[in-house]
């Protein structure tokens, strides 16, 4: 039996729409992510679901993304004259769906890594990552890797999609704390994509290029002040903020409390605030708990970048 944990991820990081993503873990050691357990059975295939958010999963097993991961893995293995073993997959759904924290990516990545390890790793990391992107595209409507890549590989990942690589890891800032606030409401990725304009002004395109280029440069040269200043979003945030509760007010208040940057995590409704130290992070967490959460399913976590990525649990 194997138990595979896949951590939450924050895509875009404001400045890198569909291009940047970070794996995230709470500093208190709690597991913010999904777990997939895989084990032998005498014959056939079984899928079970558990976890806090299990009630949010599709009722039909065929619509469960873990089932779809199993089917895709089986198809790819057959192309290599291989066959899947009789097995049971159990998804522990600990991540809220439509949260902006890579919930679907957690399930996809944990399932595919579990299946690959269970079958003695017939697929390389890049082959698995390509499968992960394909499955993610079925949910959101377009293939993108900014959640699955950091969730799988850890760290902050830049999508390059050239020279045989889907992504490359960016050096980042170990001193930064990420305060993540999920309000307890759902925003579908497809809905959040549909709200974006079909085209952008030249001014916005230039600004986006300047911000992203400067941010990547700042990461490589370890200029934390410049990196934080460049965490601006002219592509998605102006259009998506209407889907989030009191976003403009919360963003300004977070800045007043000492946040280096605040933005939408993925397609929302989770937001993130970057804090320079734990004292500021604690202030931000307290504020967001009282002013951003909408119901008792919401939560706030003080986090750091998770450099391990997906891993087996003991």
Swiss-Prot record:
Protein EC: 2.7.1.39
GO molecular function, one term: ATP binding
UniProt keyword annotation of ATP-binding present: yes
Record InterPro entries: GHMP_kinase_C_dom, GHMP_kinase_C_sf, GHMP_kinase_N_dom, GHMP_knse_ATP-bd_CS, Homoserine_kinase, Ribosomal_Su5_D2-typ_SF, Ribsml_uS5_D2-typ_fold_subgr
Alphabetic keyword roster: Amino-acid biosynthesis, ATP-binding, Cytoplasm, Kinase, Nucleotide-binding, Threonine biosynthesis, Transferase
Localization annotation: Cytoplasm
Any one of the GO CC terms: cytoplasm
Keyword match Lipid metabolism: no
Principal place of residence: cytoplasm
Binding site for ATP: 96-106
GO biological process, one term: threonine biosynthetic process
Alphabetical list of PROSITE patterns matching this protein: GHMP_KINASES_ATP
Recorded catalytic activity of this chain's protein: L-homoserine + ATP = O-phospho-L-homoserine + ADP + H(+)
Pfam families, A to Z: GHMP_kinases_C, GHMP_kinases_N
Pathway: Amino-acid biosynthesis; L-threonine biosynthesis; L-threonine from L-aspartate: step 4/5
Its biological purpose: Catalyzes the ATP-dependent phosphorylation of L-homoserine to L-homoserine phosphate.
NCBIfam families in the record: PRK01212.1-4, thrB
Protein family (similarity comment): Belongs to the GHMP kinase family. Homoserine kinase subfamily.
Cross-referenced HAMAP family: Homoser_kinase
Protein name, per record: Homoserine kinase
Record organism: Mannheimia succiniciproducens (strain KCTC 0769BP / MBEL55E)
């Amino acid at each position: 039996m194997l138990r595979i944990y896949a951590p939450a991820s924050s895509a875009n990081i404001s400045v890198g729409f569909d291009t940047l993503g970070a794996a995230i873990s709470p500093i208190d050691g709690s597991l913010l992510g999904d777990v997939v357990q895989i084990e032998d059975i005498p014959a056939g295939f079984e899928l079970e679901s558990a976890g806090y958010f299990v009630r949010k999963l599709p009722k039909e097993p065929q619509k469960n993304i873990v089932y779809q991961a199993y089917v895709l893995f089986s198809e790819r293995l057959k192309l290599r004259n291989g066959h899947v073993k009789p097995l049971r997959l159990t998804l522990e759904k600990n991540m809220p769906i439509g949260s902006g924290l890579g919930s679907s990516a957690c399930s996809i990545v944990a399932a595919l890594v579990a299946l690959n390890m269970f079958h003695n790793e017939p697929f390389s990391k890049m082959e698995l990552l390509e499968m992960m992107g394909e499955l993610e595209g079925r949910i959101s409507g377009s293939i993108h890797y900014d959640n699955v890549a950091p969730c799988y590989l850890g760290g902050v990942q830049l999508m390059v999609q050239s020279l045989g690589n889907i992504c490359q890891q960016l050096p980042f800032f170990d001193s930064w704390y990420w305060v993540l606030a999920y309000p307890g409401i759902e925003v579908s990725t497809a809905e959040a994509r549909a709200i974006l304009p079909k085209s952008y002004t030249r001014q916005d395109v230039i600004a986006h290029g300047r911000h992203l280029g400067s941010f990547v440069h700042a990461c490589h040269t370890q200029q934390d002040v410049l990196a934080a200043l460049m965490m601006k979003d002219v592509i998605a945030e102006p259009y998506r903020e209407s889907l989030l509760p009191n976003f403009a007010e919360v963003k300004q208040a977070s800045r007043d409390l000492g946040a280096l940057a605040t933005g939408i995590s993925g397609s929302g409704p989770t937001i993130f605030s970057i804090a320079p130290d734990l004292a500021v992070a604690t202030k931000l967490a307290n504020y967001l708990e009282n002013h951003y959460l909408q119901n008792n399913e919401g939560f706030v976590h003080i986090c750091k970048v998770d450099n391990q990525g997906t891993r087996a649990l003991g």
